[in-house]
Amino acid sequence: MMEYIDISILNPAEYNPRLLTNEAQEDLKKSIKELGIIKPIIIRQSDKRIMAGHQRTKTMKLLGYTHVPAFILDGVNSTDEVRFNQLHNYAECELSEIQPEINVSLPKGTEGFYTVSNKDISILSKGGNNSRVVDLTKMILRYGQFANAICDHTGKVIISTVYAKTVKLLGMDLLVYVLPEGKEEIALKYFSKEYGVFE
């Protein structure tokens, strides 16, 4: 379940391998200014350590945010911490033709975070990435849900489609972020960028 957490109590993980270039930092600032925080970070319950979302947290601090949306997970081992980071970053780069096509039913005028019941999630085409579904399934069953999907105002999922498919197949409800009308291209532009370089 997503919660809003005081950003000042969060601790960065030592293993985070990505460094932000100045250009990427500016792009990330622009995306947050234009879209807001549409993707929660992942933190560890025991010590509030960030497992995924380091660069966005850093940028939110620079922009003056005091609270951040986060999934809080308990009992995560060190191997799975790194795995969460990888899965989280993969969702930023999954914009390809082999993705499943997913629609969700939304009340008219819905914007921002919204929980969609499982019966209101429709898989229109299965796409590929069955191995990714298996990976996501293992992590969700072990720790609970840790991500959201992003959809346009009509309910078409445009980012994190594989995650949405996995949640549907597991019979669970799905947290989505519903973009305001006309913001789809902006979101796709920013999510197709690489925010950070690996050391």
Regions flagged by a language model, labelled:
Residues 1-178, 187, 191-198:
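Short, charged/polar connector segments at secondary-structure boundaries
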